[in-house]
Amino acid sequence: MNRAVATCCIFLLLSAFLCDQVMSKGGRGGARGSARGTARGGRTSRARGSPAVRVAGAAAAGAAVALGAGGWYASAQRRPDDSSERGDDYYSNRTNWELYLARTSGATVHDSTITRLSALLLPINYMMHFAP
């Protein structure tokens, strides 16, 4: 699975998890159309899952996509063992000091303005969403 597709699926499922139908309903509150019941001429409503069940399903699907993407990333990082002889490091996980030093020596900190801006706007968004 492509990393961009996995990220898109995660954001799609998170938006389904965070956006409830009540919050996204436009217009005035109250029942409209067939939700009024049969006494006013509406159709009988079909059985739907409760919001808690739908939210739990969306959360489970998001967790499954996240675990799948994590497993894909971990398998992509693994290197095949191409040595013909099996020495002392056959049962090791290749975390000797030289490998660690080679992987971390070129590491740089990426602190862009977008990261700082999102770190500032995310709590404000949460406060506006959950404010009474």
Curated annotation (Swiss-Prot):
InterPro entries: Shadoo
Lipid-binding residues (covalent, GPI-anchor amidated alanine): A107
UniProtKB keywords: Amyloid, Cell membrane, Glycoprotein, GPI-anchor, Lipoprotein, Membrane, Prion, Signal
Biased composition (Low complexity): 33-50
Positions of the UniProt region annotated as Disordered: 26-50
Sugar attachment sites: N93
Signal peptide positions on this chain: 1-24
Location in the cell: Cell membrane
Membrane topology: Lipid-anchor; GPI-anchor
Predominant place of localization: membrane
Tissues in which the UniProt entry reports expression: Mainly expressed in brain. Also expressed in embryo and retina.
Coiled coil: none
Cellular component, GO annotation: plasma membrane; side of membrane
Prosegment location in residue numbers: 108-132
Family recorded in the similarity comment: Belongs to the SPRN family.
Biological role: Prion-like protein that has PrP(C)-like neuroprotective activity.
UniProt protein name: Shadow of prion protein
Native source species: Danio rerio (Zebrafish)
